[in-house]
Design a protein with these regions (language model features):
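Short basic/hydrophobic patches in alpha-helices and adjacent helix-turn junctions
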Residues: 116-120, 141-148, 178, 182
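Interfacial loop-to-transmembrane junctions
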Residues: 108-109, 146-180
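N-terminal transmembrane signal-anchor/hairpin module of polytopic inner-membrane proteins
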Residues: 1-12
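Short, flexible coil/linker elements and helix-boundary hinge sites characteristic
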Residues: 7-8, 64, 152-156
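Functional transmembrane core segments of multi-pass inner-membrane proteins
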Residues: 14-141
Length: 182
């Protein structure tokens, strides 16, 4: 199997890479929805997997199928830039939001997850995931908030309501946007 993957069959390589990336994104989404935490073993570990795969499968970033030295270095460099630029951008967005909101606006797990996404998708995929995740989160959460407001009104305890100021995990929306990009 490994020889087939390294041998240059693009369809098998893409399937292999897609399965690994989708698995990481699904696992992270489920854990983040249940616990509001993203474990480092998946975010940082996923970043390391993305960097490694970019070295051995430069096709991940659109380079030649043949495992030649220049393509391998270019794939690794593209992955590294994606990791750094994506996570840095989200860090600064979170820092600016914290300044205005006077409270934590974004978890560190989301920043590390975006590094993983950048390692697999490049910096363009990371930027797409930030804004795509924000749009998906908004589009999917507004109906939930409206239905809850209509159905529950003031009968539901304050700590169980969705609404402004209630923490909503961003990781699943980042993951959905990343999978759309990938």
């Amino acid at each position: 199997m490994i020889l087939l993957l390294i041998g240059g069959n693009q369809d098998l390589q893409n399937l292999f890479l897609s399965m690994i990336f989708a698995s990481i994104m699904i696992i992270v989404s489920v854990i983040d929805l249940e616990t509001m935490l993203i474990p480092d073993r998946f975010s940082i570990g996923g970043s390391l997997v993305g960097l490694s795969l970019s070295l051995f499968f430069p096709v991940l970033h659109g380079f030649s199928l043949s495992p030649l030295q220049p393509e391998m270095i270019a794939g690794l460099w593209t992955s590294f830039l994606g990791l750094i630029i994506s996570s840095s951008l989200l860090f600064w967005i979170g820092s600016i939001a914290e300044t205005f909101l006077k409270k934590e606006a974004l978890g560190q797990g989301d920043i590390k997850l975006l590094g993983c996404i950048g390692a697999f998708c490049g910096w363009q995929g990371g930027v797409f995931s930030i804004f795509g995740g924000a749009i998906l989160g908004t589009v999917l959460m507004i109906p939930v908030l409206v239905v809850q407001k209509i159905r529950c009104g003031k009968d539901q305890p304050e700590n169980e309501k969705f609404g402004w100021g209630v923490e909503i995990p961003f990781g699943p929306f980042l993951a959905m946007a990343a999978l759309l990009y990938f």
